Amino acid sequence: MPSDFTLKAANAVHRALLRISFGRWGTEFYGMPALELTTIGRKTGQPRSVMLTAPIVDGDDYIIVASRGGDPTHPAWYHNLRGTPTVEVSFRNGPRRAMTAHILSAEQRAPLWSRITADYPVYGDYQKRTTREIPLVRLTPVTEGA
């Protein structure tokens, strides 16, 4: 399982790659589209950003995986969006958009998890490393007047 240092370093490198290439590189990772998720820190109240992949893009919705490489604990961003589900997302280095995070129920998760692990088996490997069920989160655009 990756250490906090490794995860933070990988995020910094990913952001730097996007920045120095003016978005030409780093918009995909392992064949999945990349996005930058900004949550509000549950303890600090400050914006916190992380680079993630979206193994499923469903129209304007993105499905993200709270795997943390199969670590026994959920990633910090997952805890943050549980507290404040309104987030900002920059998809493939595009403009930031307000979105709402919906943690999927077991029934909603099952067909999507099967699809994700069929297309990207590494997620199945992550699940084998941990006893926790790896959550899936659907990000949906905030609609006007909502």
For the regions a protein language model found, what residue spans apply to each?
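Extreme N-terminal tail/first-helix region
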Residues: 1-28
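Short beta-strand segments
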Residues: 32-67
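Short hydrophobic/aromatic beta-strand or adjacent loop that forms the aromatic wall/cage
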Residues: 34, 133-136
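Short strand-connecting beta-turns/loops that link adjacent beta-strands
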Residues: 57-59, 94, 144
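Short, structured beta-strand-loop surface elements
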Residues: 68-120, 129-133, 141
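Non-catalytic, usually N-terminal nucleic-acid engagement modules in DNA/RNA processing proteins
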Residues: 126
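Short beta-strand-to-coil "C-cap" segments at the C-terminal boundary of structured domains/repeats
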Residues: 139-145
